[in-house]
């Protein structure tokens, strides 16, 4: 094979492929897998962060009966929008107690550069979209923009669980950043935000360095 074609094939093989797409059925349900609340299929969270998230959400469930799942995925290819994927996963897993609609799904799609938070109708009064939006803008996205997925996810879950438990939440924004914070989808108890593209490009660049190094 000519060297030029070998080089082209190598480059193409290292690019993100449609095979990375994930279906609802392929996302491990943490409740069934190990009795927890976190499914990190994108591998962006540390073990210590997952442990702390599980602790916070277990405490929330014990005190209020509300349930929360934290999910990371490489992308949501094959679905109309990241929000559509999130809503379908929320319903597929049946997050929240039966008859109470008191579930929350916090989803991060790295490839789509999206943060999606879906809330059950039973929580809309205490956790309206406006409050969720505030948490995303002030606590989650600024940290994600700095490459801190652990910190952003923890900060978001801490705020969400505090609100759901009726605890006072300090309205202190995180450090300022260049994150795009315009809302692109806010409907039916769901809030979506974009993650700055430079962060994902940095992740892909790092992946390329690891593969090629």
Predicted regions, residues:
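Folded, non-transmembrane soluble domains that reside on the lumenal/extracytoplasmic side of membranes
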Residues: 20-203
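Bacterial N-terminal signal peptides that target proteins for export
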Residues: 1-5
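Bacterial N-terminal signal peptides
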Residues: 6-17
């Amino acid at each position: 094979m000519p060297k030029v074609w070998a080089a082209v094939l190598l480059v193409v093989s290292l690019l993100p492929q449609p095979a990375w797409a994930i279906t609802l059925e392929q996302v491990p349900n943490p409740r069934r897998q190990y009795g927890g609340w976190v499914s990190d299929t994108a591998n962006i969270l540390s073990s210590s962060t997952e442990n702390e998230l599980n602790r916070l959400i277990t405490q929330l469930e014990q005190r209020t009966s509300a349930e929360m799942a934290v999910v990371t995925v490489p992308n949501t290819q094959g679905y109309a929008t990241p929000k559509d994927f999130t809503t379908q996963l929320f319903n597929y897993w049946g997050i929240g107690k039966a008859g109470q609609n008191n579930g929350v799904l916090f989803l991060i799609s790295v490839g789509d550069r999206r943060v999606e938070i879906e809330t059950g109708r039973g929580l809309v009064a205490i956790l309206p979209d406006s409050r969720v939006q505030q948490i995303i803008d002030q606590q989650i996205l600024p940290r994600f923009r700095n490459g801190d997925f652990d910190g952003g996810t923890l900060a978001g879950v801490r705020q969400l669980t505090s609100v759901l438990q009726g605890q006072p939440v300090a309205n202190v924004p995180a450090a300022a950043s260049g994150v795009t914070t315009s809302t692109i989808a806010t409907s039916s108890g769901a809030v979506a935000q974009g993650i700055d593209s430079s962060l994902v490009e940095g992740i892909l660049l790092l992946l390329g360095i690891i593969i090629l190094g």
